Design a protein with these regions (language model features):
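Generic protein-terminus/edge-of-domain signal
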Residues: 1-72, 77-100
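Short helix-to-turn junction characteristic of helix-turn-helix DNA-binding domains
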Residues: 47, 208-211, 260
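Basic/polar phosphate-binding segments, predominantly the helix-turn-helix DNA-binding elements
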Residues: 173, 177-183, 203-254, 271-296, ...
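An amphipathic alpha-helical interaction segment
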Residues: 110-119, 125, 130-206, 210
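Short, Lys/Arg-enriched N-terminal segment that forms or immediately precedes the first helix
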Residues: 28, 186-190, 240
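Double-stranded beta-helix
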Residues: 85-109, 119-131
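Residue at a beta-strand N-cap/secondary-structure junction
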Residues: 62, 215, 264-265, 280
Length: 300
């Protein structure tokens, strides 16, 4: 058995990314804005035109951004975004931004965030660095990213019906392109895909993804990986940053979330499709991993 790209695409398709663009505007002179970080959001900044500088709180060298560049913060690390290499001392009010104008002096910015469930962040982003600066012209997916960025920039200059909703949905696409870019550069950045690029783990993980409703144990997965139970568990936990059975439960609960979102499936049927013989055991696992009872997730 093998985990086909379509299976992974189906996993991503079921995700509700919920991207929101919270700032679009034209900035001039000695502007700067800071975020304390520490939230459960994943954030990004897009320079539509002009330039900007990113200052991390660890004292590292400021990073320069130019038109089309993306600053990506998988774990909402604290940072300051400014017009110049040196952060101005005077306060700056960006609560009432001027409309974006790509022909005006200064810089045009588009900032957004998305709030992935904690279990999804662990599967997808746990190994990502605090900060990624992406130059599309140097990216393996640069052509697609540039086309999307041009579309977002053009849309951000409009004052028409649906602009906010369109920018939010385009931000979903931008997030996926950022993930694609990152995995082209370093396949093991994503704990989920790290298992499928590891010769020792791939047979076991692929078999589970093919048949999540079957009875899975560490012993069974280790056998498929031709490893001892302890060696398999150690390697798996090191790569994925969670034990094998926690991964199994997390994957199953994401499948369950998709089925519950449809609103019509029987709870026991969902439980059995996710490898649980009783509805009570399924409800307990769902609440532990997702954070809410499955009944509240139905139809969301």
């Amino acid at each position: 058995m093998s985990a086909t790209p379509q299976q992974l695409n189906d996993f991503l398709r079921r995700l509700h990314l919920g991207s929101e663009v919270y700032y679009v505007g034209q900035l001039c002179d000695a502007w700067h804005m800071s975020t304390p970080g520490g939230s459960d959001a994943t954030t990004f900044h897009l320079v539509c035109h002009g330039e900007a500088w990113i200052h991390m709180k660890d004292g590292s060298e400021p990073a320069r951004m130019t038109a089309g560049d993306i600053a990506f913060f998988p774990h909402d690390a604290a940072h300051t975004f400014s017009a110049h290499r040196v952060i101005p001392q005077q306060p700056f009010d960006y609560s009432h931004p001027a409309p974006l104008d790509v022909h005006a002096p200064g810089s045009g910015l588009l900032c957004g965030h998305l709030r992935l469930p904690a279990h999804i962040r662990r599967l997808m982003l746990a190994s990502f660095p605090e900060f990624m600066l992406i130059h599309p012209e140097a990216s393996p997916v640069g052509h697609q990213m540039r086309s999307l960025i041009e579309m977002m920039t053009e849309e951000a200059t409009r004052n028409e019906l649906g602009v906010t909703a369109i920018l939010d949905r385009l931000s979903d696409a931008l997030f996926l392109y950022v993930i694609r870019h990152a995995l082209h550069m370093e396949p093991k950045l994503s704990p989920l895909l790290a298992t499928l690029s590891d010769d020792h783990l791939r047979p076991a993980v692929a078999a589970f993804i093919d048949a999540p409703a079957e009875a899975w144990t560490v012993e069974r997965m280790a056998g498929l990986a031709c490893q001892s139970r302890s060696a398999f568990s150690e390697r798996f936990t090191q790569l994925v940053r969670m034990p094998p059975m926690e991964f199994v439960a997390t994957w199953r609960m994401q499948l369950a979330s998709g089925m519950l979102a449809d609103g019509n499936a029987n709870m026991l049927d969902i439980a059995m499709k996710c490898g649980y013989e009783s509805e009570a055991a399924f409800r307990k696992a769902f609440k532990r991993i997702i954070g809410i009872p499955p009944g509240k997730a139905r139809g969301n």
